[in-house]
Amino acid sequence: MRTWACLLLLGCGYLANALAEEAEIPREVIERLAHSQIHSIRDLQRLLEIDSVGAEEPLETSLRAHGGHGAKHALEKRPVPIRRKRSIEEAIPAVCKTRTVIYEIPRSQVDPTSANFLIWPPCVEVKRCTGCCNTSSVKCQPSRVHHRNVKVAKVEYFRKKAKLKEVQVRLEEHLECTCTSASPSPDHREEEAGRRRESGKKRKRKRLKPT
């Protein structure tokens, strides 16, 4: 009975020690990662002030850790493989930037009142902000956008005859991107002069007539 109690105490102590070692990542570390430029594992290592990068455990060490005569005997019988140095390619991050994506033109942009028509071309290429940021606390979002109008063909059928009409569709292009918080709505700076003029106008205050 005393032996079982000792084993239970040892197990609880080991579990507490393991939980203490696997601490939660500090908030300041997440913030530092979110607002830093990281292009490689070496940059990440330098930013977190880590002296060395851990490697995978060798086969001999793994078998030795499990112990026992059976593991040693299996290692002796196993043919020794010819070790070849393989250069493993480092993962290239998909950074937050503008990329060409396929945009399917919504039917509501062409004619929201009808459903019996075709659009050509149905898809176009636009520049949009894509990619990942260093942490999930920030998202890749546009910081500067531009709108342009393009012509598409709207094809309808009347009395078994095709009728084609050109319709203007407004497309949004992303010019610059940034990693920012996902909750607040981004303040896009429009490229169109008309919108800048409208935003620059001051509202006139109405004077109240004395009663």
Swiss-Prot record:
Q: Give the matching Pfam families.
A: PDGF, PDGF_N
Main localization is secreted
Q: Which residues form a coiled coil?
A: none
**Residue ranges, compositional bias (Basic residues):** 198-211
Q: Where is this region: Receptor binding site?
A: 158-162
Q: Where is the protein localized?
A: Secreted
Disulfide-bonded cysteines: C96-C140, C129-C177, C133-C179
Query: May I ask which residue range the UniProt record assigns to the signal sequence?
Result: 1-20
User: What does the annotation say about its assembly with partners?
Assistant: Homodimer; antiparallel disulfide-linked dimer. Heterodimer with PDGFB; antiparallel disulfide-linked dimer. The PDGFA homodimer interacts with PDGFRA homodimers, and with heterodimers formed by PDGFRA and PDGFRB. The heterodimer composed of PDGFA and PDGFB interacts with PDGFRA homodimers, and with heterodimers formed by PDGFRA and PDGFRB. Interacts with CSPG4.
Q: State the protein's name.
A: Platelet-derived growth factor subunit A
Give the species this sequence originates from: Bos taurus
